[in-house]
């Protein structure tokens, strides 16, 4: 018998067959988890951008509709210890010694009506109308035909020189156009 048939047969490149198998990389094993996390982050970012842009749109719409109400810091002290003066009036609900009480309604200003004609400026038109400028014109025309508007005189000369910004400050609500025109 030949001993050839009983000899084990070894492959020529025995080292290649017994080389250790490398483990898969981190990305290949967790690829789907990483992709899902990226998609979720993108969705969250898109939702946040949408929410903030809608807030900006709502704020812009509120400015356009002129519905913004500003707080009057002088409202509580506005009529505290004020003595009534001839030719001026206070709003309903305002008392002379009510420090700490909020004043309701729009206060009347001490601004005298001018002899200038009414312009197309909505802020000054409203201020003149609040002081009785155009409303006093018919009464003034009958009393003094040459003077279309009456001039209110008060004892307090500082109130006669009140600016338009101070008049706006005394109001409870302002519109966007009021603020633009007061600058």
Swiss-Prot record:
- The UniProt regions of compositional bias labelled Low complexity, in chain numbering, are 130-143
Q: Where is this region: Interaction with host DYNLL1?
A: 149-161
UniProt GO cellular component terms: host cell; host cell endoplasmic reticulum membrane; host cytoskeleton; membrane; viral envelope; virion membrane
Query: What does the record say about induction?
Result: Expressed in the late phase of the viral replicative cycle.
**What subcellular locations does the record give?**
Virion membrane; Host cytoplasm, Host cytoskeleton; Host endoplasmic reticulum membrane
Q: Which domain of life is it from?
A: Viruses
Report TM segments.
32-52
Keyword set, alphabetical order:
Apoptosis, Host cytoplasm, Host cytoskeleton, Host endoplasmic reticulum, Host membrane, Host-virus interaction, Late protein, Membrane, Microtubular outwards viral transport, Transmembrane, Transmembrane helix, Viral attachment to host cell, Viral envelope protein, Viral release from host cell, Virion, Virus entry into host cell
The answer on whether this UniProt entry bears the keyword Transmembrane reads yes
Q: Where is the composition biased (Polar residues)?
A: 111-122
Q: What does this protein do?
A: Inner envelope protein involved, through its interaction with host dynein, in the intracellular microtubule-dependent transport of viral capsid toward viral factories. Seems to induce caspase-3 activation and apoptosis. Plays a role in virion morphogenesis by recruiting and transforming the host ER membranes into the precursors of the viral envelope. Involved in virus attachment to the host cell.
Q: What is the name listed in the Swiss-Prot or TrEMBL entry for this protein?
A: Inner membrane protein p54
